[in-house]
């Protein structure tokens, strides 16, 4: 059986934590931020943990892990 490939988009966008959760960056931070208030920009800084419903699918696309 051939080796399974990791989806390249998943490699770029997600990281696995030590406990098995999936971290991702928050969307909507690239441009046109002048129309958002400071609280929106501040709270969407950094990364967040992916929802449990989506975690299984991301792990399917990365069969050998992400780190």
Curated annotation (Swiss-Prot):
GO biological process, one term: translation
Molecular function GO labels: structural constituent of ribosome
Superkingdom of origin: Bacteria
Keywords associated with the record: Ribonucleoprotein, Ribosomal protein
GO cellular component, as recorded: cytosolic large ribosomal subunit
Homology family: Belongs to the bacterial ribosomal protein bL35 family.
PANTHER family given in the database record: 54S RIBOSOMAL PROTEIN BL35M (PTHR33343), LARGE RIBOSOMAL SUBUNIT PROTEIN BL35M (PTHR33343:SF1)
Protein name as it appears in the record: Large ribosomal subunit protein bL35
Lineage, opening ranks: Bacteria, Pseudomonadati, Pseudomonadota, Alphaproteobacteria, Sphingomonadales
Gene that produces this protein: rpmI
